[in-house]
């Protein structure tokens, strides 16, 4: 998982409340047995004018010119600005996979669905909760100025605007540690590899029958 320390990126405003996980990545794309390739289908039913299916060549599909991520001014955005209750609905880890693979490093909103919020941390996407007033201000700024960028300082837990205004946000120390050092669940386990090997060696000495292979 990629480390997240300080990130500066273009902001794309998604001015909709209660965006659920089926809107983030529609259910038909959950059939895939791979963990990759979901970025092209992020917000599929909003980005395209036709119905998408797994394995389809998205480069030939008709796009919805009115959808925010299809507008040239937001091309390459790495921060998604959203409204309250983002990520509600069914639990699917494919939602943060799609956001990450599209290129988003962070999502800013007044509130998130709990399961989605936790899944973001596990997959390298930083979900940031700000007040509705702060989010309203960022929407106004993003829509008023082309190329609007924010700086996110995870160590300092601040979102910094171009004029230097800093908004503080909360993050659990454990989640912060994992993002700062790029540690997913596997990475966290491997931090204790020496202890695991020592335990395995001791277990074989104490219970050798567990190491016996069946014919």
Swiss-Prot record:
Keywords: Amino-acid biosynthesis, Branched-chain amino acid biosynthesis, Leucine biosynthesis, Lyase. Gene3D superfamilies: Aconitase, domain 4. GO terms for molecular function: 3-isopropylmalate dehydratase activity. InterPro entries: 3-IsopropMal_deHydase_ssu (IPR004431), Aconitase/3IPM_dehydase_swvl (IPR015928), AconitaseA/IPMdHydase_ssu_swvl (IPR000573), IPMI_Swivel (IPR033940), LeuD (IPR050075). It is an enzyme of class 4 (lyase). Its EC number is 4.2.1.33. Belongs to the LeuD family. LeuD type 1 subfamily. This is 3-isopropylmalate dehydratase small subunit. It comes from Polynucleobacter asymbioticus (strain DSM 18221 / CIP 109841 / QLW-P1DMWA-1) (Polynucleobacter necessarius subsp. asymbioticus).
């Amino acid at each position: 998982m990629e480390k997240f320390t300080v990130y500066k990126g273009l902001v794309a405003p998604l001015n909709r409340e209660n965006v659920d996980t089926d809107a983030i990545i529609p259910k038909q794309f959950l059939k895939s047995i791979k963990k990759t390739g979901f970025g092209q289908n992020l917000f599929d039913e909003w980005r395209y004018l036709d119905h998408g299916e797994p394995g389809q060549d998205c480069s030939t599909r008709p796009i919805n010119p009115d959808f925010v991520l299809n507008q040239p001014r937001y091309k390459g955005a790495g921060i998604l600005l959203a409204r309250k209750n983002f990520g509600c609905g069914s639990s699917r880890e494919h939602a943060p996979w799609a956001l990450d693979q599209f290129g988003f490093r962070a999502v800013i909103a007044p509130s998130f669905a709990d399961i989605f919020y936790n899944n973001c941390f596990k997959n390298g996407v930083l979900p940031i909760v700000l007040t509705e007033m702060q989010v309203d201000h960022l929407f106004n700024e993003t829509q008023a100025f082309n190329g609007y960028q924010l700086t996110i300082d995870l160590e300092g837990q601040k979102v910094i605007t171009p004029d230097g205004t800093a908004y503080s946000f909360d993050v659990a120390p454990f989640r912060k540690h994992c993002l700062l050092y790029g540690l997913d669940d596997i990475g966290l386990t491997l931090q204790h590899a020496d202890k695991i090997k020592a335990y395995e060696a001791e277990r074989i000495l104490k219970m050798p029958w567990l190491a016996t292979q069946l014919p």
